[in-house]
């Protein structure tokens, strides 16, 4: 991108020879200052960060009964460091690596939201439109026409649709129903929209159906073409490919009687678009980079900056505060799927994921473009990962030349 800017400037200087040389030199100097500032904002001194961060990672694994974790740090538009700890398979003593595959859970939800908002940018719907107006094969049941469920409600967990999950062992005979069949039988609100925040996997199964309906492309194919491929998420999939199976971690839960870690079954679910997705921390880092850089990854844009800013803005002030009591401070709340908050004057985005022996977390500082991604095969380890993520970002801020790139609002 910078090469393109310099080439353009040289062409303009050649084309307009009559213009003041001093003026053109002024423009060039300003551009160089801009480049220097951006580069400085993305520099993190890992020699200072890692001696403090790595012991914290080890303590987190111990405190959270987490067999293994793969971790990545992001600054600007790059992964600046990655490492892995513990064993992805305790019985085989298989060391985890940055290429170990885990289930990423609900961290996938924001990817599905991007897919839906891509359709919004094509003019297919507006955020505050009634969803039922776009459903032809079935409807959201129990809806009060005076208080209709909108697209914004779906993306903020305020629709009144229930949580739902419906898990089955991955090697069992039970096959999850198609999106159409599941939604036709299950899509019913339990309360009016905006009554409260109720984390809803069913809502995001409907989001997947809507992406498919608007685009005319099967949902899994659409996600592959419009999210995974442009972001070079080559080891992320709804079902692990053979090469991913070779790197797949075993999910573990803690035996309540003995305190020991036990392998548990991987699951499939009726609401699989809500987070039954597998990936690596390196792929998660690419996703986080796109969200910290205005919707672009290596000059490939997946969403406009204006739409992404909507995603990263808290939507309903009445629901500010902790996200279901587990993350954030008094400013925290849902954007369009992403969790958002302001801490120490900086704006943050975050999301976790947890399914049957796996816990994942993503945290990004929007104003300094710093990010932390972690995938684990520990069960319900959220509080430990949240503390570790905050520590990692704080250390990167402390040991960097990262000047604030924008002002929190």
Q: What is the role of each PLM region?
A:
Residues 1-20:
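N-terminal secretory signal peptides that target proteins for export/translocation
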Residues 25-36:
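Bacterial N-terminal signal peptides
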Residues 37-41:
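Sec/Tat signal peptide C-region and signal peptidase I cleavage site
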Residues 42-83, 212-225, 229, 262-409:
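Catalytic loop of the DD-peptidase/beta-lactamase superfamily, centered on the K-T-G motif
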Residues 62-95, 127, 169-176, 234, ...:
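A short, well-structured edge-of-sheet supersecondary motif
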Residues 63, 90-201, 217, 242-266:
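Active-site-proximal loop and beta-strand segments within enzyme catalytic domains
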Residues 82-85, 164-170, 224, 238-241, ...:
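Short, solvent-exposed loop/turn and secondary-structure capping segments
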Residues 112-113, 203-208, 285-286:
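Well-ordered alpha-helical segments within folded domains of soluble proteins
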